[in-house]
A protein has these predicted regions:
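Terminal, non-globular segments
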Residues: 1-173
């Protein structure tokens, strides 16, 4: 039941991401993304290969439904997915993966969750903005876009992490 609930939330958030990219493009110096936190909050029982397939499908759906270069979101999202477990281990410690706990900002701490979200979003945006610019934008414009997008996307992603990773289990197993 939990995975069904997570699947519905994931698809609704993917649709919200597509709507934001299509209809709320305020300035060319801002890219709002919630895809990295969606990947970060996948269950830890999900294998790396299944996570990569989910990331590829999510990126493909976002690229296909958004008026932009096809493959750009896939290019940026797959490395985030590939580095998800090492990132979680680096931020939360290896005991999270050893115990088989799920990611939860309430149980593991909102500060640590914000650090993990910021790191995954930074990796996504670094690849996305660099590939999107492709040498056509000056470095200052790319840096401003990266900083503004990282700040806004990380702030938006923290409540989304609470939505995707509810603390429904006991504190300790």
């Amino acid at each position: 039941m939990r995975h069904w609930n997570l699947s519905v939330k994931y698809l609704l958030l993917l649709a919200a991401q597509v709507l934001v990219w299509n209809y709320f493009n305020f300035t060319p110096l801002l890219t709002v993304t919630i895809l990295p936190v969606m990947i970060l909050c996948l269950p830890l029982g999900c294998s790396v290969s299944m996570s990569l397939v989910i990331a590829f499908a999510s990126g493909f759906a976002a690229d296909f439904l958004v008026a932009g270069p096809t493959g750009l979101t896939i290019l940026a999202l797959v490395p985030v997915t590939f580095l998800r477990r090492p990132l979680l281990s680096m931020v939360f410690g290896s005991e999270l993966l050893a115990r088989g706990d799920e990611v939860s900002s309430r149980r593991l701490g909102r500060t640590k969750m914000l650090i993990a979200i910021t790191l995954s979003t930074a990796l996504f945006l670094l690849i996305y903005i660099t590939a999107d610019s492709a040498g056509t934008s000056p470095l200052w414009a790319m840096a401003v876009k990266f900083a503004a997008s990282l700040a806004l996307s990380s702030a938006i992603s923290l409540p989304i992490a609470d939505l995707l990773c509810p603390d429904t289990e006991a504190r300790w197993k």
